[in-house]
UniProtKB/Swiss-Prot annotation:
Localization annotation: Cytoplasm
Job of this protein: Specifically methylates the N4 position of cytidine in position 1402 (C1402) of 16S rRNA.
InterPro entries: RsmH, SAM-dep_MeTrfase_MraW_recog, SAM-dependent_MTases_sf
GO biological process, one term: rRNA base methylation
Protein name: Ribosomal RNA small subunit methyltransferase H
Pfam families attached to this UniProt entry: Methyltransf_5
Keywords of this entry: Cytoplasm, Methyltransferase, rRNA processing, S-adenosyl-L-methionine, Transferase
Gene name in the database record: rsmH
Record-level Gene Ontology MF annotations: rRNA (cytosine-N4-)-methyltransferase activity
Source species, domain of life: Bacteria
EC annotation from Swiss-Prot or TrEMBL: 2.1.1.199
Length: 297
């Protein structure tokens, strides 16, 4: 079974208690939810926009009957979901942001530049209509360049966008392998650098397709209103754009003058929490993870 990143650190901060209600806003394979349910006699409401995660929910239902509840949805709808379940307040909300290992490893989902598959990148095929193929084949060259630069921090964004525009004139770009080849034709891999040249471009397009940063902002805004006093919001993020949003929004909530919530918060960890050396050795994907948490006063 896959162990989610910073699991022990998340549990130490959340400190699940009997009789409390928690939300796993990014259910995935259910690692956080399972750990919370094993820690206390509590309830967990799990949310994930990926329909494929339902199979993991079914396993948890058998292990924890009546304790776990699941909804296929974007977590930006967290307020509507909980109110629909007759819940006004909860005691903790956890987020593990970004693409999951199982999504990356499934070539048919179109997230990976190392496995050829349809150029999709949607975390939900039923909720989202525009996939990565539509974007790269129909967006203006300037828009593609801006997305790759803004969301990927790619300094060769204009060269990549130009190469994409030239390639699609000949035939539509339909697979991850085709897109990765186009990017690699523009950027040569450095001998001293292990990161694939296509990494930043794929990250940027994925973020745009799924509106990930907008989702994160809305998720935090609504979560702040849903917590009981003593409740906690915990966010694990994997790149600087996400972490910057979390840091700024948490600072605003804790400043005492936030327009998001009139009730005060305080930082649980003033310094960002990172994975241990041992965890990085066991799971290299965790190397960029950062955990931030706040407490509702």
């Amino acid at each position: 079974m896959h162990t989610p990143v910073l699991l022990n650190e998340m549990l130490d901060i959340l400190n699940p208690q009997d009789g409390k209600v928690y939300v796993d806003a990014t259910f995935g394979a259910g690692g956080y939810t399972r750990a919370i349910l094993k820690s206390a006699n509590c309830q967990v409401y799990a949310i994930d926009q990926d329909e494929c995660t339902n199979v993991f929910y079914e396993k948890l239902v058998n292990d924890f009957p009546g304790k776990v509840h699941f909804c296929v949805s974007k977590f930006s709808k967290i307020k509507q979901i909980l109110h629909g379940a007759q819940l006004k307040k909860v005691d903790g909300i956890v987020f593990d942001i970004g693409v999951s290992s199982m999504q990356l490893e499934d070539a048919s989902r179109g997230f990976s530049f190392s496995k050829d598959g349809p150029l999709d990148m949607r975390m939900s095929t039923s909720i989202s209509n525009v996939d990565a193929s539509v974007f790269v084949n129909t967006a203006f060259e300037e828009e593609i360049a801006n997305v790759i630069y803004q969301y990927g921090g790619e300094k060769y964004s204009r060269k990549i966008a130009k190469a994409i525009a030239e390639s699609r004139k000949k035939k539509p770009i339909k697979t991850t392998g085709e897109l990765a080849s186009i990017v690699r034709s523009v950027i040569s891999r450095s001998k001293n650098h292990s990161i694939d040249p296509a990494t930043r471009t794929f990250q940027a397009i994925r973020i745009w397709v799924n509106k990930e940063l907008e989702e994160l902002e809305q998720g935090i805004i609504d979560s702040a209103d849903l917590l009981n006093p003593g409740g906690k919001i915990i966010v694990v993020s994997f790149h600087s754009l996400e972490d910057r949003i979390v840091k700024v929004m948490f600072k605003s909530l804790c400043s005492g003058s936030s327009v998001i919530s009139p009730i005060g918060f305080q930082l649980i960890n003033k310094k960002v929490i990172r994975p241990s050396f041992e965890e990085i050795l066991n799971n290299p994907r965790s190397r960029s993870a950062k955990l931030r948490a706040i407490l509702k006063i």
